[in-house]
Every structure is written in structure tokens, then in C-alpha cells.
A protein has these predicted regions:
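Conserved class I S-adenosyl-L-methionine
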Residues: 215-222
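Glycine-centered loop/turn positions within well-structured domains
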Residues: 142, 204, 216
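Active-site proximal loops enriched in glycine and acidic residues that flank catalytic Cys/His/Asp
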Residues: 148, 181, 200, 222-223
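Class I Rossmann-like S-adenosyl-L-methionine
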Residues: 1-187
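Conserved hydrophobic/aromatic pocket- or pore-lining residues that grip, position, or stack substrates
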Residues: 144, 198, 206, 222
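Glycine-rich helix-loop-beta junction characteristic of Rossmann-like nucleotide cofactor-binding loops
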Residues: 188-189, 208-214
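Class I SAM-dependent methyltransferase Rossmann-like catalytic core
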Residues: 18, 190-197
Length: 223
């Protein structure tokens, strides 16, 4: 999905940074809530499509009032999406404003996992099931690995701060920084100069636990 989004933006370089961020949040939000959005669309009698999911997420996931959404789409017919059709306006107005989740949703839909996988996860996670699945519904943190050949964590943190990007030390890896908020890390000089790379802190820990020494050959086997 990230490659599709990046390719779409590459073909539309006129889109500003704020709009890029807003569009990205919409796309990722819809992906994280696909099952729940589908459930809501069925409740209000709407056909599932990319557009209907975005409209539903704008109301259910971002708290936009249906009336405000109607006015917003009617105010910019040149660059914005097409105004709502009468049928779209009908079902959008039926959407509640209390969020994506509902007590009537089956567990697999509420937790955004296939039924068969939910059964297996319940067996393996037991009492931690709900906490783990709730975490998967949240945006992932942006972790960075400091390149020790070029910098140290404190120096890399200062370099990023100079570009307006605040970070905090990782909790476990001595080489990790975690971005506070979402920022275009790849556009920073610190990233271009190789001071940091984007890498999950868990992956950094795996690399440390292998005990790799200079001269060793490593096979990075990714399932």
C-alpha cells in the first residue's frame, strides 16, 4: 500500500505536504478499518467501493458531520472529489457519529481479522488477545535506527530536531529513536546523509540478539 500511495503522489507532484498527509491518513485509516466500514455500509444500504469507504471513514473515523461533508464536497468542484449523489447523501446521513465500532459487530469484524485467524489468536494470546488486537488497530510508531558508522543516537537526535522533527530514545534498542508524530523522515537531510534509517525497534533487537560480529555472513530470511 505504501508503494501505491508513493507512486500516486509521484504522478501528482502539485499536491502540497498537508494534503499529502491528509490523503495518506485517509487511505491508511480505511485499510485499518476495512471490515468495520464494510459492516456499516451494509447497515445503511450502501454498496462497497473505495469512494464509499472513504466517505464512511470521514464520518465514522474522523468525526466529520454528514452535513459538513455535504457542504465541503459542494464547495470545491474543480480539484476536490465529486459532490455526493442523492443516493450517497441518503446513506451518509444515516451514519452515526459515535465511531467505527458497535456492540452488534461480530468479533472478527470488530477486531479486523478473519474468523479463522481470530480462533488461532485466541488460543495463543489468551488473556492478551484484546490488548494485542487493539494495538493493531492503531497507527504504527515510526522507529529509526541510528547508523553508528556515521553518528551516535544523541547526535542524530539533534540533527533531526534541527529539521523540526522531535524524537525520543527507543525503549529497548540502544540504537533506536522513535519519531514523535508522523513526519516525512525520508525528506530530511539526516536521512539522506545516512545518519538514520527507518527500522522497527523489534527488528533492531533481533539484529542485536544474533550477536553478529565483523566478518560473519548473514542471511536475512524474511517469510
Amino acid at each position: 500500500a505504501d508503494r501505491v500511495i508513493a507512486g500516486w503522489f509521484k504522478q501528482r507532484r502539485f499536491i502540497g505536504s498537508k494534503d499529502r498527509r491528509a490523503i495518506s491518513e485517509l487511505v491508511w485509516g480505511c485499510l485499518r478499518a476495512t471490515a468495520r466500514l464494510g459492516w456499516w455500509l451494509r447497515q445503511v444500504g450502501a454498496a462497497e467501493s473505495a469512494r464509499s469507504r472513504v466517505l464512511a471513514f470521514t464520518v465514522l473515523g474522523q468525526g466529520e458531520k454528514p452535513e459538513s461533508l455535504l457542504r465541503l464536497l459542494e464547495s470545491d468542484t474543480r480539484y476536490g472529489p465529486q459532490p455526493l449523489s442523492k443516493e450517497e447523501a441518503r446513506w451518509v446521513k444515516r451514519l452515526p457519529s459515535h465511531g467505527l465500532s458497535h456492540s452488534d459487530q461480530p468479533a472478527a469484524i470488530a477486531w479486523e481479522v478473519p474468523e479463522w485467524l481470530l480462533v488461532r489468536l485466541a488460543q495463543s494470546l489468551d488473556q492478551d488477545l484484546e490488548a494485542e488486537l487493539a494495538a493493531l488497530q492503531e497507527p504504527a510508531a515510526v522507529d529509526l535506527r541510528v547508523n553508528l558508522l556515521k553518528s551516535r543516537r544523541r547526535e542524530a537526535r539533534r540533527a533531526l530536531a534541527a529539521e523540526g522533527i522531535e524524537t525520543e530514545p527507543g525503549r529497548w534498542s540502544p540504537h533506536a529513536l522513535r519519531s514523535i508524530g508522523r513526519h516525512p523522515i525520508a525528506a530530511t537531510r539526516a536521512y539522506r546523509d545516512g545518519l538514520v534509517e527507518i527500522q522497527d525497534e523489534g527488528s533492531q533487537l533481533i539484529a542485536l540478539l544474533t550477536g553478529v560480529a565483523p566478518g560473519m555472513r548473514v542471511c536475512d530470511f524474511c517469510a
